[in-house]
């Protein structure tokens, strides 16, 4: 029904009179939904929009006693102007890929608890990735994934997946879908293209990386020729399948290029790598500039990610030598030395107005993207391949078993888990505050006791939970 801006959707009345802007429409929608004692997810196409919607929503002060311990933990460890904190103080959860995993989990738990008062969730597509919620209402901000030059229209499958988040988790018989972008309904009502897989379609042109995973009957002549070339290159170098088949996101040809680059290094450069590995395995792990630069030069030609490639290309002049080094070294060394907060503080100082909430949120997104995307995913996969090829080269050169060759495994483990011991890695995978991971990685019991004694109320609760899992 529609009479002068008044609309009824599934028994709920909304008044959009003189509310043409999205901000005003979302305010009206959420106000009415909350008055009806319901909850809602606002799907946003970007992290920035998810944060903006949370910031713009005006809500009366909320009694946060239910999650005071969690809120106190956030205030103790993060800037109070961070939108995740500001939003929670008014009962709104912000959920996207740049929010630390343990905070994402806690926000979903609060949203699913009626007594918490967290009744609104602003989110990107992370809400469709294995997350169950009690949402009654789904509001679509924009019918896209991403924004700017990286933005893509939602497919019918995506749209139905988003819409399907409303009325789930055995909580509601039906859900309510409301969209602020009419294109969303065009997409969701479309039959959509049949979902196909390039590995099972002879008519789809494949990249070299797809060839290995495509059944024989779906390969064209070009793919077959490439596979023969790769097999010949592999056999000429004697690289076993079990080594070349790891890190499937990088093509075998690129792995062989990395192997060839390692084999072509001079004795001086091999000595630098050896020194780099020795420093990694010292009691206090450290990055050695010259060896790390050799590794970056080895992998550079196969790196496809624009951000990582730029960080390798751009260099700085060393104060203590005539050499130039990749800024990736400086950034990674800073992270390993000072952690998330150290990188965040550096990024915040570079913002135009460091005291503003917009600067805080921008610095948090940049820091999270650098650590979680560039370091822990992009860099890990390339130096992971370097590690495979380097250890194989050393095992052949020195005629020792592959397992006895020393590589950069310590750095890979540190980047992937930020932890070394098995218990610490389990905790990291589960998603816990860093202090709990540090507890399990403690070099001795005295240090473990010191860290445990510094746990705040929230960390104590999570520690008990993960400790029960580890000690089962």
Outline where the language-model segments fall.
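Long, hydrophobic alpha-helical segments
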Residues: 186-239
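Charged, low-complexity hinge/linker segments at coiled-coil and domain boundaries
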Residues: 59, 63-82
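Conserved interdomain linker/interface between the two RecA-like ATPase lobes of SF2 helicase motors
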Residues: 1-56, 93
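SF2 helicase motor core recognition
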Residues: 104-108, 121-138, 164-174
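Amphipathic alpha-helical transducer elements in NTP-driven molecular machines
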Residues: 47-51, 104, 152-160
């Amino acid at each position: 029904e529609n009479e002068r801006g008044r609309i009824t959707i599934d028994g709920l009345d909304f008044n959009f009179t003189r509310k043409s802007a999205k901000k005003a429409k979302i305010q009206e929608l959420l106000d009415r939904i909350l008055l009806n004692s319901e909850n809602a997810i606002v799907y946003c196409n970007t992290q920035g929009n998810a944060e903006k919607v949370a910031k713009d929503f005006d809500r009366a002060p909320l009694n946060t006693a239910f999650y005071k311990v969690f809120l106190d933990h956030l205030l103790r460890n993060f800037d109070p102007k961070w939108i995740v904190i500001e939003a929670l103080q008014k009962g709104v959860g912000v959920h996207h890929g740049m929010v630390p995993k343990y905070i994402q989990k806690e926000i979903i738990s609060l949203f699913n608890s009626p007594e918490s008062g967290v009744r609104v969730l602003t989110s990107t597509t992370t809400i469709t990735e294995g997350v169950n919620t009690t949402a009654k209402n789904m509001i679509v901000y924009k019918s896209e994934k991403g924004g700017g030059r990286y933005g893509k229209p939602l497919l019918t499958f995506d749209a139905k997946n988003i819409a399907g988040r409303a009325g789930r988790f055995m909580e509601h018989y039906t859900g309510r879908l409301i969209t602020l972008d009419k294109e969303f309904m065009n997409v969701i009502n479309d039959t959509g293209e049949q979902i196909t897989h390039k590995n099972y379609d002879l008519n789809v042109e494949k990249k070299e990386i797809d060839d290995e995973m495509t059944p024989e009957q779906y390969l064209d002549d070009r793919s077959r020729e490439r596979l023969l070339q790769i097999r010949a290159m592999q056999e000429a170098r004697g690289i076993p399948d079990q080594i070349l088949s790891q890190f499937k996101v990088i093509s075998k040809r690129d792995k062989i290029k990395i192997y060839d680059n390692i084999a072509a290094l001079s004795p001086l450069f091999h000595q630098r790598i050896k020194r780099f590995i020795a420093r990694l395995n010292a009691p206090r792990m450290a990055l050695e500039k010259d060896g790390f630069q050799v590794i970056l030069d080895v992998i550079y030609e196969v790196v496809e990610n624009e951000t990582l490639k730029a960080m390798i290309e751009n260099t700085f002049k060393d104060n203590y030598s005539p050499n130039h080094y990749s800024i990736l070294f400086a950034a990674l060394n800073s992270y390993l030395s000072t952690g998330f907060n150290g990188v965040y503080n550096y990024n915040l100082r570079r913002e135009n107005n460091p005291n503003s909430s917009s600067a805080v949120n921008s610095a948090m997104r940049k820091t999270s993207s650098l650590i979680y995307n560039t370091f822990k995913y992009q860099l890990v996969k390339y130096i992971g391949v370097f590690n495979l090829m380097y250890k194989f080269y050393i095992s052949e050169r020195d005629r020792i078993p592959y397992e006895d060759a020393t590589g950069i495994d310590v750095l890979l483990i540190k980047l992937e888990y930020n932890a070394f011991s098995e218990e610490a890695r389990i905790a990291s995978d589960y998603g816990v505050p860093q202090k709990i991971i540090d507890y399990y990685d403690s070099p001795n019991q005295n240090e473990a006791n010191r860290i445990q004694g510094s746990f705040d109320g929230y960390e104590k609760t999570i520690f008990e939970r993960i400790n029960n899992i580890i000690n089962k």
